[in-house]
């Protein structure tokens, strides 16, 4: 039987960290409660009595807090950062008292080498009301008097949005790509991260292909109006897995806006992707005809249905033994592109599954070459990739 509700309010409980059954206290992670946070995605540690009283913030500060609690539940190690701050670690007790700073990362050599932090931003969604939060990555030799092509790195979710709000080591799909002469942007969208709200998370239900697209297009339009160094006429898009699906869909839904895409390991047809994914995130539509007969529609719109819309430059990449997204997801798109008489490019990565292991560096340079050719007008000639050193940089980047 339900005894009582422990927490309430317009914020999100992410996970229970531990329960002190003797003192009847629960420690948990939550976000979007602290009014001083610059983004609702920042997680904090809290404690509250099981009867709902005594709610207390343990890890304050306008940061994303990664916490670890000792077995006695007396002490907490807090690793905190934003995308534009030096990561640091502090020790707290379970009452929220900061006992000491344990460590602060030394970025002196990075700064001497020219490193610059990415920049967080916020824009409005296509509804003109919902706030969206994102991160902008610039070349380290950025010149505000120049105009740069724009690349949108995407992941649709709906379990996350491919946007990091804490500091992470350089991501080849964002920071590193920007060093090739691009402004790279990532942002959330309605239907994305579950930590925003139930309404926000469910926005894409029943519309699994199209739901994030309008928000990204409108977000980029706002940024290009706000920042004159961003060229709205040279916009590319790329992503992996769900992001591969999304980047191709963007090219086909907004073919006059997105000019170039590198789409990697995309689940372009969610009717043949993992069955639970479509049923959970797209759902089953109940249809009643004029006679009162009920039928159920489980079909999900696909990218290959839109192949005839392609206008720009599309590079499709897939591992030939992908154990998450079957290569058939890309092949069906290829088939329809051929039938529609479209030019496109394709790279099959032999002997590789969903992530490309030692071929990740090759994938990175092919992506750089593709965007450089079609967004910057710079084409590498010859067969050799001069800077290539095969290796696996994938360490949890989505």
Question: What does each model-identified segment do?
Answer:
Residues 28-40, 160:
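Short, conserved, GDST-rich strand-edge loop motifs in beta-rich repeat architectures
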Residues 66-398:
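Serine-hydrolase catalytic core recognition
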Residues 9, 38, 296-300:
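A conditional alpha-helix N-cap/helix-loop micro-motif detector
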Residues 26-30, 76-79:
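Residue position within the beta-strands of beta-propeller blades
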Residues 41-45, 53, 87:
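Repetitive beta-architecture junctions, highlighting loop-to-beta-strand starts
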Residues 1-22, 31-34, 48-65, 94-126:
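Multi-bladed beta-propeller domains
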Residues 36-42, 82-85:
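Short, solvent-exposed loop/turn segments at conserved positions within beta-propeller repeat blades
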């Amino acid at each position: 039987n339900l005894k009582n509700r422990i927490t309430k309010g317009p914020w999100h409980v992410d996970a229970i960290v531990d329960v002190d059954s003797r003192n009847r206290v629960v420690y948990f992670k939550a976000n979007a409660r602290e009014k001083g946070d610059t983004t609702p995605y920042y997680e904090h540690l809290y404690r509250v009595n099981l009867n709902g009283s005594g709610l207390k913030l343990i890890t304050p500060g306008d940061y994303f807090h990664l916490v670890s609690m000792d077995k006695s539940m007396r002490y907490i190690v807090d690793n905190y950062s934003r995308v534009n701050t030096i990561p640091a670690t502090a020790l707290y007790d379970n009452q929220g008292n900061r006992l000491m700073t344990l460590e602060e990362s030394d970025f002196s050599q990075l700064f001497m080498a020219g490193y610059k932090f990415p920049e967080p931003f916020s824009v409005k969604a296509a509804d003109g009301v919902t706030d969206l939060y994102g991160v902008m990555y610039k070349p380290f030799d950025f010149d505000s008097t120049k105009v740069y092509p724009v690349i949108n790195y995407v992941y649709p979710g709906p379990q996350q949005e491919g946007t990091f709000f804490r500091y992470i080591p350089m991501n080849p799909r964002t920071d590193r790509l920007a060093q090739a002469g691009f402004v790279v942007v990532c942002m959330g969208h309605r239907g994305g991260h579950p930590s925003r709200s139930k309404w926000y998370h469910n926005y894409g239900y029943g519309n699994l292909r199209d739901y994030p697209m309008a928000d990204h297009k409108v977000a980029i339009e706002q940024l290009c109006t706000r920042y004159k160094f961003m060229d709205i006429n040279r916009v590319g898009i790329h992503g992996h897995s769900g992001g591969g699906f999304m980047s191709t869909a963007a090219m086909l839904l907004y073919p006059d806006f997105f000019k170039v895409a590198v789409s990697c390991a995309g689940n372009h047809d969610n009717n043949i992707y993992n069955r639970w994914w479509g049923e959970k995130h797209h759902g089953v539509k109940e249809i009643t005809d004029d006679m009162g007969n009920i039928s159920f529609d489980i079909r999900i719109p696909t990218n290959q249905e839109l192949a005839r819309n392609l206008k720009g430059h599309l590079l499709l990449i897939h591992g030939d033994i992908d154990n998450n997204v079957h290569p058939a997801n890309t092949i069906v798109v290829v088939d329809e592109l051929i039938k529609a008489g479209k030019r496109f490019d394709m790279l099959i990565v032999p002997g590789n599954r969903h992530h490309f292991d030692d071929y990740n560096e090759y994938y990175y340079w092919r992506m750089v070459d593709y965007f450089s050719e079609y967004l910057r007008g710079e084409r590498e000639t010859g067969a050799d990739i001069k800077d290539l050193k095969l290796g696996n940089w994938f360490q949890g980047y989505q």
